[in-house]
Amino acid sequence: MAVITQERKIAKWKIEEVKELEQKLREYHTIIIANIEGFPADKLHDIRKKMRGMAEIKVTKNTLFGIAAKNAGLDVSKLEPYLTGPNAFIFTNKNPFEIQLFLSKFKLKRYAMPGDKADEEVVIPAGDTGMPAGPALSIFGKLKIKTKVQDGKIHVTQDTVIAKPGDPIPPDAIPILQKLGIMPVHIKLNIKVAYDNGLIIPGNQLSINLDDYKTDIMKAYQSAFGLAVEIAYPIPDVLKVSAEKAARNALSLAAEIGFITPETVQAVFSRAISKAYALASAISGKVDLGIQVPQTQQAPAQQAEKKEEKKEEEEKKGPSEEEIGGGLSSLFGG
């Protein structure tokens, strides 16, 4: 008995879709997969318009994308964990971090739905609501919104906050918010993953704090520049600082060893005078070098004790002039 097999016919649109995806995968080196579950189609259209010239956004079936990726030579196994649920595929040659930063700044809002929490302060503004007086008045009363009826319409008499950021939005307020055109819920594309030249970057690693990033870069630059100065790396900006540092070190060394040149003489003598003052301060009670050393004011009892000590010292033989001269000579590099 002959077995009759029927070849499964693939829809033409699927073939064309795979070809288009494959072409984009070869054209762009970065592919971003974003979750669009519950994301309004009109808001996705707004994002598509905003990103024109920067990236292309395509909504397609995960299976078709997987086939196209395989045909384009991508490692599909790395992407398979993210090919679940409704997705949008963003094709770009920009850095994925740049795309994430752009999307984070592109704020979108939607109307509240039951169970939503406010992403911003929700205020019912004072003025004409355009709503006819009737059953709606009881809703305003329940929400503790002060109103009045004027020309058959409900007017709110003062701005009223009905929810703060993070608070649940009262279900009774939802139709009023919609009527007034108030959208208190923020939405954004939830990026699952970025595929950049074969590198997989999970979505949670694409968000960076710019201030922290700038601080880290500045610290890295300062460390690198400090090291470059230390080793006198031969580039103009570094050599200028290295030369200044070397000059300061050389001047300090010359002053320390008493090496006199026209450039170092002031530093040498300044250092020597400082040492002379220090020595004079240490031995001023024993010998008069002709250098006035400031003395702190002492109590009368201490002054009397010092006078007695000085009298005893004067009775002893002090150092010879040759010894004193030799000490000063050593201070000045002689």
Swiss-Prot record:
Keyword RNA-binding belongs to the record: yes
UniProt superkingdom: Archaea
Regions of compositional bias (Gly residues) in chain numbering: 325-334
Pfam families per the UniProt record, alphabetical: Ribosomal_L10, RL10P_insert
Region span, Disordered: 295-334
Secretion signal span: none
InterPro entries, alphabetized: Ribosomal_protein_uL10, Ribosomal_uL10, Ribosomal_uL10-like_insert, Ribosomal_uL10-like_insert_sf, Ribosomal_uL10-like_sf, Ribosomal_uL10_arc
Disulfide bonds: none
This protein's GO CC annotations: cytosolic large ribosomal subunit
Residue spans of biased composition, Basic and acidic residues class: 304-320
Annotated GO biological process: cytoplasmic translation; ribosomal large subunit assembly
Annotated SUPFAM superfamilies: Ribosomal protein L10-like
GO molecular function, one term: large ribosomal subunit rRNA binding
Alphabetic keyword roster: Ribonucleoprotein, Ribosomal protein, RNA-binding, rRNA-binding
Function as written in the Swiss-Prot or TrEMBL entry: Forms part of the ribosomal stalk, playing a central role in the interaction of the ribosome with GTP-bound translation factors.
Classification via NCBIfam families: PRK04019.1-1 (NF003095)
Family that this chain belongs to: Belongs to the universal ribosomal protein uL10 family.
Complex formation: Part of the 50S ribosomal subunit. Forms part of the ribosomal stalk which helps the ribosome interact with GTP-bound translation factors. Forms a heptameric L10(L12)2(L12)2(L12)2 complex, where L10 forms an elongated spine to which the L12 dimers bind in a sequential fashion.
The protein, known as: Large ribosomal subunit protein uL10
Organism annotation: Sulfurisphaera tokodaii (strain DSM 16993 / JCM 10545 / NBRC 100140 / 7)
Lineage of source species: Archaea, Thermoproteota, Thermoprotei, Sulfolobales, Sulfolobaceae
